[in-house]
């Protein structure tokens, strides 16, 4: 029977690197019986390489704004193309991290279940998990960095209290997915670079779908999604609160702060939680994590490192944040000065042309003749 390989993230586990790998190695995948479709429809802020996004549709829309008829039409068109691919290939690969947080909220799994009932293909779900505190911080960091959302101004404390759409009960979510596809059809991998097959997420994913990488495969050396340092993240969060902030300025702020974050200095020695806070936060998930290790990772005694060691808790206003703030505003000032100089030069040139109209016309005639020759 044909196999649909569905990679569902979770978010913040190098999903883009996996998707680019599948896209860039389409020809080699095809030779080994796999196909990675790239569909023609586009969703806001979603790369086309996220080819399973049709299962959840536009996640930015509220329930009232959604068009179920349009979503169903796209779903049927997508599966029409998938069934055509199955005529030539034994395996079709789909990938989108939104299925983890939104799959049940927006009926993606229910739609998939109906297709499975047709008994045309079997399914293998691949999911990467990272420790809940690390996942939450990485998620918050990304939301703040992107900006332009209500949640982009959340403090760390607010994020922990509200956790919008984030599914941290890994075991509970896996059990719901298992009810649709069967537990035996779920492959759980730890998002831990030290444990990846071949020391690379691409090689590890290939192993998860039954492939062994050969020398011909391309792995993009730089699929960068730079996380802001904790200090730069706090600066960006405060900037997100500015009234009248538009996309152009938001992108500019993000660019500068991402540049600063490329030199993280001692950022890694800080944690957003103290050791007691970390233990309390993780205590909610320890039993579920233990059961995942027992039921999905046969032979492993635990899912994540549970030593919970913390060097220092990060606090706003520390010396690194002061340095980042000074650097950021220095970069903005230099950029404005440079732009001002360019405008002054343009104004000077324009004034000269206005004061010497005949010379300006003569120069244009000379230039046009040179071009004609």
Where are the language model's segments positioned?
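Anion-recognition interface
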Residues: 1-373
